[in-house]
Amino acid sequence: MKRLISTLNLSKEDWLRYRKCGITGTDAGAILGLNPYRSAFQVYHDKISDTFENIDNEAMRQGRDLEDYVAQRFTEATGLKVRRANAIYQSEEHPLLLADFDRLIVGQKAGLECKTVSPFSADKWADGKIPAHYMAQVNHYLAVSGFDCWYIAALIFGKELVIHKITTDKEVLNNLIAKEEHFWKYNVMPEIPPVPTGSEGDTQQINQLYSADDRNKTADLNPIRDLLDKRQELSDQIEQLEQEKASIEQQVKLEMQDAAYGTAPGYKVSWVSSESKRVDSQRLKKEQPDIFNRYSKNVSSRRFTIIHASQFLYAYRHTKFALQLFLFNRKAQYCLHNNNCMLR
């Protein structure tokens, strides 16, 4: 590997700009479809856009602030000294692959990735487990560096420090590199987005890309008619399964009667009363319009609906029947008013 640029005096914007020039360790899990918080679709749009994806939150802030502490605890536990990398590195064999290492192990061809973990996610590290997207990240670092092994030190708040050693597996690395290079060659370079995964992140990305609508424009969806048919088929299946699920829940309630709780091998069931207070917005708007307006805000969004032809037919028949019933009632009222009960 080679040292691409020092990060000691690198601005956040320049750091983000360099990361757009290739695939980084945090991109790896998303490209493989292993990251529950980010997808290949999101990585793609980050790479091709002119803007910088400066994502930050409290968990990420704590991770940065506690990186030194985790590294110190790793040294205490293993006796291995570490040093900062202070650079963005690039694979010489595969220049597309970039990396920004947390720490390098002094005197060894090895590195360290520091993690902080919520106690609510402790089960993901239990019994020797490592979250899949972190495994992808570490293997990416092994691919960039050509090192023999990489360590992960995960501080689970209030519980323990978990340390794992991952050794180089050529087959795994070759597979990872092939998928990353395929993503870059067939998606990023020709600017052809990968298929969305259905994740919430992908929905947010699409809504951000197309936040406004043109009411004078209608798209021809014939080329993807098969997708619409597939969606309708899935919707029908979901509706049937939801009804079956509701039927089962009703049977369970009949079995429980007035019992608040129920048990069966492998199951705990509760059916308890609860109370909650909700704001009656219509009444508040009517009786206290000033207060309602003061705490109200306009939210703009695009509503997405798909209506199948069968639903059009149902709506037409329902509307036609309702109209006939309305006319019949009007005629009946007229006859009764005029003492004429002959309805024709």
Tell what function each PLM region has:
Residues 1-327, 341-344:
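Accessory terminal regions of nucleic-acid processing enzymes
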